[in-house]
Design a protein with these regions (language model features):
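Membrane/wall-proximal cationic-aromatic binding patches
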Residues: 182-202
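Transmembrane and membrane-interface helices of multi-pass
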Residues: 2-188
Length: 202
């Protein structure tokens, strides 16, 4: 009962800024984890966070109540949850072409066996992001909204982070021509793999 009381107390004190940062960090979580465990150049680890953090910040700033935007990103959030589950099977890997093809071509028995092996990661990842949708709902239904001053300030911070990331990428591209955003930065890498998977299916 104490936990429930504390939760109610937190909900009563939380404002849109609190919701905003919780949802931003929830969107960024796969990038942070991949930057730690994924085998990629150091510049790729940095860009994985520096490029996507301001993008997520700006997306959630596009509405006075960030929870509404978060619900609009439902498919992306599902992809995040799937990516975190995948890391428990293939440490340091993003959703790849062969993995996507296996989803459509695997036998029901094989799929059932795989699901039984990753049941706990699915529950953990699904539970975490279910809680973020609760936060998003609280944000969307709240009478309060992000103040214009906060939105302007965070938008400026986001642009500044992008301006820092841009020369890092340009410098890395000159030194390492093989560095591509579609390969180094999640979820761009997954979307590119989805494109490759569709071309192989048809």
């Amino acid at each position: 009962m104490r936990i429930w009381d504390r939760l109610q107390a937190w909900v009563s004190r939380a404002d849109q800024r609190c919701y905003y940062w919780i949802l931003t960090l929830a969107l960024l979580l796969p990038n942070v984890v991949l930057s730690v465990v994924m085998q990629q150049p150091a510049v790729g680890r940095v860009l994985n966070i520096l490029l996507m953090l301001p993008v997520y910040m700006l997306l959630l700033l596009s509405a006075k109540r960030p929870g509404r935007v978060y619900w609009g990103l439902f498919v992306l959030v599902l992809l995040h949850a799937f990516q975190l589950v995948l890391l428990t099977i293939f440490s340091g890997s993003v959703v790849a072409v062969d993995m996507l093809l296996n989803i459509f071509t695997s036998e029901p028995d094989e799929a059932g066996e795989l699901l039984s092996n990753i049941l706990w990661p699915i529950l953990a990842s699904g539970g975490f992001y279910a809680l973020t949708f609760v936060v998003a709902t609280l944000s969307a239904r709240s009478r309060e909204s992000l103040s214009p001053r906060f939105r302007r300030r965070m938008a400026l911070v986001s642009v500044l982070i992008l301006l820092v990331a841009l020369p890092i990428y340009i410098g890395a591209k000159k030194r390492f021509p093989y560095v591509h955003l579609r390969a180094e930065v999640y979820p761009m890498s997954v979307f590119y793999n989805m494109y490759l998977a569709t071309t192989k299916l048809y």
